[in-house]
Amino acid sequence: MPLDPAPASASVCPAHTSACPASVSTCPSSGSASPARVSACPSSGSASPATPKPPEPAPAPPVRFWPVDDLPGLDPDPFLDELSRDEPVARIRLPFGEGWAWLVTRYEDVRFVTSDPRFSRERVAGREVTTMRPVPVASQTAGLQYVDPPRHTRLRRVVARAFTGRSMRRLRPLAERRAAELLDGMARAGAPADLMEHLHGPFPLAVLRDFLGVAEEDRQDWAATGEALLSAGADSGERARQAARATRERIAGLLRRRREEHREDLAGVLARAAAEGEITDDEAVSLAIAVQVSGGHAVRNNSGSMMYALLTHPAHLDRLRREPELLPRAVEELFRYVPHRNGVGIPRIATEDVEVGGRLIRAGDVVYNAYLAANRDPRAFPDPDALDFDRDHLAHLAFGHGPHHCLAAVMARMEAEVMIGAVLTRFPALRLAVPPEEVEFQRRGLIRGPRTLPVTW
């Protein structure tokens, strides 16, 4: 049943005009600032009685339930397509939690919400909101996900020390060597083979092990807990809680060892920062968990989806073989094109009344951003459902935007380039071993991707 819509308010300053900056709550005037919720912003000097009033924000729409069903292959979510077209700022209810939330789907609106300080992640902590899963993946009291500047800036600065250009240059040869070894193993196993088993599954974990400092013998345990940590089914609550506890214990043990070993991996960076009082032990563990999720499970599925996209677009695959210098640009377009997750991620709370896309979002309202819909917004990406390596605009939102833009993006790009480049070099005749519709994809998870990817050559 639709919930009662929130009452319309007096009009507010337009959020996306040069006259009313989105990052402040006052309208410019000559003299003192005027309140944010006035009927009009003076264009110059003093307001004229003839100045027309801006349109009233539209009444709040009814609340719609979004079950976030599994989708075939790389199909975009039809619910998001509908909202982006007809109701770009909508009210929704998700499978878990309480209440309703706003869902923002258009590219410019998503960029606005993710960069405006009036939308807070920190205020989500401890609040019951409608959500995608029964328990949070990350700690709501530590780490980067649920904090705002200036605390977020302090934590991000620590983690950024591990994501320098120098560290990526050190890591890339190791990644290239690991990819070559894995593909040699696939060649020895013979065709047909499962590319997820031989490359996309073990490769990100191997790179993560080198980057974070995970021992070889612990790799499979880390993979298993990563899968459970991101499960989203109704029956997955206890399994996810157990995985969260096991992950935190494993990482805490790794950080304790790093305090004595003084190694230059991410665990060493975090352990030193905690020992010197820059961050707490809980923050160090939560930061490492964030890297595990983005650097292991997410890369596995996203890179597998990229390869599936190429294998189902043979002309694009052939072009990459002929023009390998195109690979970095192709990877950016694949990040935009591939629906990397189901549903939405971490919400924000409006700290004051803000107008977005013609809707008045009240202080205290919950707001989600649909990055998937933004990446298929035809206003930003003409012919958005086409895979186009020559696209002029490549500023996708697959890694988010604003202060919470994914720190691991530089590593994810490197890994995608290494994997795709290695496959094209080692198996120039690679193709799917089954019809595209027979490729099995993950079910009931937050991150979308192939479960298996049968190939031959």
Residue ranges and their predicted role:
Residues 24, 31-34:
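Low-complexity tandem-repeat tracts in intrinsically disordered regions
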Residues 1-20, 27, 37-457:
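Cytochrome P450
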